[in-house]
């Protein structure tokens, strides 16, 4: 769920892009939302990126890709300091100071063929620490842009623990996992140990053994026989909520 400020900013960016063909500047966004500094805009844009609504394009000034908008936004009031109610939104990429760019090619997969985000089941919690009981049944679902996933079957798990912090995975994050039973050395995987315990670790191989490596020096690497470990999937994306 987005905060009011996040919704206001998304609505303002959408409206400005439709009216002018270019995204607003940070100063314009700051003034529109009546914020005292541009750092607040940076935080809002980062939060919208992490929730799959916006994406900033690297090495380009004022380049913002709008991936999706919540359904409620199409029915909401006009954006701050925007004179007319925005038309129904069509995703596009625009770059400040230039004319509107054409939609990204199909290979970019910003949205699926029906124009909706993809629903990913959340299958409980996963330990980024000491292993926990095997993966539970689906508890709820989240929606993501197809940009966050490639082909194949996916599911999400809520992280518990701090053993993967140096890989940028924090307690409370949602990890998106591509379901597969093989992985390459160095991949972060969901490992099922002895068909009882599930853990999120980096895969290493030591001879015929499997090493489950933490990204935190406080945790030891576990080395197990291949008959004790089953790969349940590979990390492909991460969602952080605030």
Swiss-Prot record:
<keyword id="KW-0678">Repressor</keyword>
<keyword id="KW-0742">SOS response</keyword>
<dbReference type="GO" id="GO:0004252">
    <property type="term" value="F:serine-type endopeptidase activity"/>
</dbReference>
<dbReference type="GO" id="GO:0009432">
    <property type="term" value="P:SOS response"/>
</dbReference>
<dbReference type="InterPro" id="IPR050077">
    <property type="entry name" value="LexA_repressor"/>
</dbReference>
<feature type="active site" description="For autocatalytic cleavage activity">
    <location>
        <position position="163"/>
    </location>
</feature>
<keyword id="KW-0234">DNA repair</keyword>
<protein>
    <recommendedName>
        <fullName>LexA repressor</fullName>
        <ecNumber>3.4.21.88</ecNumber>
    </recommendedName>
</protein>
<keyword id="KW-0805">Transcription regulation</keyword>
<keyword id="KW-0227">DNA damage</keyword>
<feature type="compositionally biased region" description="Low complexity">
    <location>
        <begin position="75"/>
        <end position="84"/>
    </location>
</feature>
<keyword id="KW-0235">DNA replication</keyword>
<feature type="region of interest" description="Disordered">
    <location>
        <begin position="75"/>
        <end position="109"/>
    </location>
</feature>
<keyword id="KW-0378">Hydrolase</keyword>
<comment type="subunit">
    <text>Homodimer.</text>
</comment>
<dbReference type="GO" id="GO:0006281">
    <property type="term" value="P:DNA repair"/>
</dbReference>
<feature type="DNA-binding region" description="H-T-H motif">
    <location>
        <begin position="26"/>
        <end position="46"/>
    </location>
</feature>
<feature type="active site" description="For autocatalytic cleavage activity">
    <location>
        <position position="201"/>
    </location>
</feature>
<comment type="function">
    <text>Represses a number of genes involved in the response to DNA damage (SOS response), including recA and lexA. In the presence of single-stranded DNA, RecA interacts with LexA causing an autocatalytic cleavage which disrupts the DNA-binding part of LexA, leading to derepression of the SOS regulon and eventually DNA repair.</text>
</comment>
<dbReference type="GO" id="GO:0006260">
    <property type="term" value="P:DNA replication"/>
</dbReference>
<dbReference type="Pfam" id="PF00717">
    <property type="entry name" value="Peptidase_S24"/>
</dbReference>
<comment type="similarity">
    <text>Belongs to the peptidase S24 family.</text>
</comment>
<feature type="site" description="Cleavage; by autolysis">
    <location>
        <begin position="128"/>
        <end position="129"/>
    </location>
</feature>
<keyword id="KW-0068">Autocatalytic cleavage</keyword>
<dbReference type="InterPro" id="IPR006197">
    <property type="entry name" value="Peptidase_S24_LexA"/>
</dbReference>
<keyword id="KW-0804">Transcription</keyword>
<dbReference type="InterPro" id="IPR036286">
    <property type="entry name" value="LexA/Signal_pep-like_sf"/>
</dbReference>
<dbReference type="GO" id="GO:0045892">
    <property type="term" value="P:negative regulation of DNA-templated transcription"/>
</dbReference>
<dbReference type="InterPro" id="IPR039418">
    <property type="entry name" value="LexA-like"/>
</dbReference>
<dbReference type="InterPro" id="IPR036388">
    <property type="entry name" value="WH-like_DNA-bd_sf"/>
</dbReference>
<dbReference type="InterPro" id="IPR015927">
    <property type="entry name" value="Peptidase_S24_S26A/B/C"/>
</dbReference>
<keyword id="KW-0238">DNA-binding</keyword>
<dbReference type="InterPro" id="IPR036390">
    <property type="entry name" value="WH_DNA-bd_sf"/>
</dbReference>
<dbReference type="Pfam" id="PF01726">
    <property type="entry name" value="LexA_DNA_bind"/>
</dbReference>
<dbReference type="InterPro" id="IPR006199">
    <property type="entry name" value="LexA_DNA-bd_dom"/>
</dbReference>
<dbReference type="InterPro" id="IPR006200">
    <property type="entry name" value="LexA"/>
</dbReference>
<dbReference type="GO" id="GO:0006508">
    <property type="term" value="P:proteolysis"/>
</dbReference>
<dbReference type="GO" id="GO:0003677">
    <property type="term" value="F:DNA binding"/>
</dbReference>
């Amino acid at each position: 769920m987005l905060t009011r400020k996040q919704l206001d900013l998304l609505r303002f960016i959408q409206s400005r892009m439709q009216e002018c063909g270019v995204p607003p500047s940070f100063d314009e966004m700051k003034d529109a939302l009546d914020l005292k500094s541009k750092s607040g805009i940076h935080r809002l844009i980062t939060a919208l990126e992490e929730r799959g609504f916006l994406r900033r394009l690297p090495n380009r000034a004022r380049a913002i890709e709008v991936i999706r908008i919540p359904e409620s936004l199409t029915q909401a009031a006009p954006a701050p300091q925007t004179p007319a109610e925005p038309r129904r939104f069509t995703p596009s990429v625009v770059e400040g100071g230039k004319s509107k760019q054409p939609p990204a090619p199909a290979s970019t997969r910003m949205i699926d063929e029906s124009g909706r985000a993809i629903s990913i089941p959340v299958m409980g919690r996963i330990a980024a620490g000491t292993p926990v009981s095997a993966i539970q049944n689906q508890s709820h679902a989240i929606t993501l842009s197809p940009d966050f996933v490639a082909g194949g079957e996916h599911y999400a798990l809520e992280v518990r623990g701090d053993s993967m912090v140096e890989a940028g995975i924090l307690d409370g994050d949602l990890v998106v996992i591509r379901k597969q039973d093989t992985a390459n050395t160095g991949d972060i995987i969901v490992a099922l140990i002895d068909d009882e315990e599930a853990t999120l670790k980096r895969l290493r191989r030591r001879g015929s053994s499997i090493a489950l490596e933490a990204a935190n020096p406080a945790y030891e690497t576990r080395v197990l026989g291949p008959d004790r470990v089953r790969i349940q999937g590979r990390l492909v994306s991460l969602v952080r909520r605030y």
